[in-house]
């Protein structure tokens, strides 16, 4: 069990890295720089805070790299619970990583557009600003695809947590519910215009947030227990 506790702590540390860098990359930086209905303001914000924008990209790389390693550590911890579900968990999590990393090229392209390259002088200011916002929109579209797998992996992961006997069943339930929250938002985002502006999208995301932050802290602080927890 000492070995399991060590594995759990490593998983918790990786998960914490994913959570913190993910919040910075996906929430904090965009909230400071991007104004979706104003290309000019967005362009100038990125130009004036280029370092913050670059840090956001680096945070994304760290986040997705940690997320690539995380499921393999969890696999080692949860293999004893159910091998098939553990394998499925790894596959579904790992699929999202190349999608997410390749998608970061859209933000790298934004850096090219705000640069001082000679060839950019032939492009009008308005067109340049519109292209910056277009690449950011491309990035968001890529994140929608990646989010499908961010949700799917939570189902086998939550099931393994629920059945483990050494992790809280309640967190397993939240994780499994989070899967369906992700799927609902994925489908809603494609079928319903301005779905993201609806309050329901944030409410549906809550189980995943509670489950993931909860299991992250549990693994990091407590690790595993000898007896079943509720």
Question: Which residues does each PLM region occupy?
Answer:
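Hydrophobic, aromatic-enriched alpha-helical segments typical of multi-pass transmembrane helices
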Residues: 1-230
């Amino acid at each position: 069990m000492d070995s399991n506790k060590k594995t759990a702590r490593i998983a918790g540390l990786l998960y914490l890295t994913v959570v913190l860098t993910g919040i910075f990359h996906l929430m904090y930086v965009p909230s400071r720089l991007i104004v979706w209905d104003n290309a000019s303001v967005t362009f100038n914000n990125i130009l004036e805070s280029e370092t913050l924008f670059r840090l956001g990209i680096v945070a994304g790389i760290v986040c997705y790299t940690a997320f690539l390693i995380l499921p393999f550590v969890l696999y080692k911890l949860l293999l004893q619970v159910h091998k098939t579900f553990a394998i499925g968990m790894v596959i579904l999590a790992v699929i999202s990583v190349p999608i997410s990393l390749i998608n970061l090229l859209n933000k790298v392209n934004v850096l090219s557009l705000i640069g001082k390259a000679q060839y950019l002088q032939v492009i009008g200011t308005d067109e340049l600003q519109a292209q910056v916002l277009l690449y950011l929109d491309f990035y968001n579209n890529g994140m929608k695809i990646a989010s499908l797998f961010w949700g799917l992996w939570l189902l086998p992961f939550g099931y393994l947590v629920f059945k483990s006997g050494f992790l809280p069943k309640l967190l397993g339930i939240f994780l499994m519910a989070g899967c369906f929250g992700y799927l609902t938002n994925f489908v809603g985002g494609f079928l319903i215009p301005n779905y993201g502006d609806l309050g329901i999208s944030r409410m549906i995301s809550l189980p995943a947030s509670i489950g993931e932050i909860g299991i992250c802290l549990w693994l990091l602080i407590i690790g595993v227990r000898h007896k079943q927890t509720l």
